[in-house]
Amino acid sequence: MAEDGLRLTNFYVSASVSSASRAGLLTGQLNTRNGVKGVGWPDSKGLPTDKITIANALKTKGYATGCFGKWHLGDLDGYLPTDRGFDYYYGIPYSNDMYIGYTHKFSPNCVFTDGYNLDKALQDQQLVKRNKNKAQLKKELNYASPLFENKEIIEYPCDQATTTYRYFNKAMEFIGKNKKQPFFVYLTPSMPHVPLFVSPQFKGKSKRGLYGDAVEEIDWNVGRLLNFLEKEGLSENTMVIFTSDNGPWLGMKENGGSALPLRDGKFSAYEGGVRTPCIIKWKNHIPAGKVSDHIIASIDIFPTLLELAQMDKSKYDLDGITLTKFISNPDNVEPRNRYLYVKDGKIVGIRQNDWIYLPQTGRRVTPKRNFEQELFNIRKDIGQKSNLFKKETKKAQEMEQLLQQQSH
């Protein structure tokens, strides 16, 4: 993809945890106001129902909309993908390290695995209903996740070793059925989130253990998808965006990934938590083999797709900006020079060009509280190791004033 498209080295997601990050991408709004601040759990509401998603918007233009994989924006009735603008959903509705919700309904044709039947599955649901200890439930139910089709469970426990392959298969099947009309596919594999699973043919494939194997499998399936689009004659009319929801879960050690040379990972407002890989490919529309270090944000995807679909952006309440001119001419167009760091629904820092200011006045910018004000020059210090707050006092004051302006 990078050889054929545009690689973004300063791409930011809206939050350093799953649900909040996904909410930012799908609404085009900062997490200060999109209603999702942290991580959702089974049997919970998620993205507020008054929020408009990319799928909601594109449906009004005649797009077929499909969601595949991890949803994590609410699993109660009214909050699942088919309630939020998607015509079809296939996947696990939250993180694959969680457990079945007691409100979920089983399809009459549900496939039960691992010695389960309907009675045993219903017992699991009653256990979840009685017990509110999340950690205990995860341990006792051993990550038994439900696989959904639209609003019903069609497999329990889900065979997680085959989910990546099946998600991509279903996405390609959906595209094939809808190739004569515009389509929007939101494809979010459960991997490489822990617990890690891979298909048998990918076990031991990498030199990076199970985590590397999971990444290899995703990579291979992305290749399958791109080949499918080419074979179907859709490559020139389909933009493909590849990214991640947040940085690596460092507490999981070798199974959690790494963001080096960036600092920290998931849960953190340092670069390793919110700066993720991103590649955009669109045959004959985006220059091939380009790399850009311009600041881009996931909230920019919504307004960009609206403009490409020739829709009126002014009808939507968005924080993102359009990237249409930038992606066709990345060398000469600078879309934005500023990014706001948001954690737990609050603005906790700002980047302006090469400077990053994190006041950290007791807020949880990192997994541990840090009361020290910090100023970094990210171009010279990509690992955020050298705090220049006391040395560059004029720049610190400038950034502090800028942050105050953005916070009001």
What do the PLM-derived regions correspond to, one by one?
Residues 1-374, 378, 382-408:
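Formylglycine-dependent sulfatase
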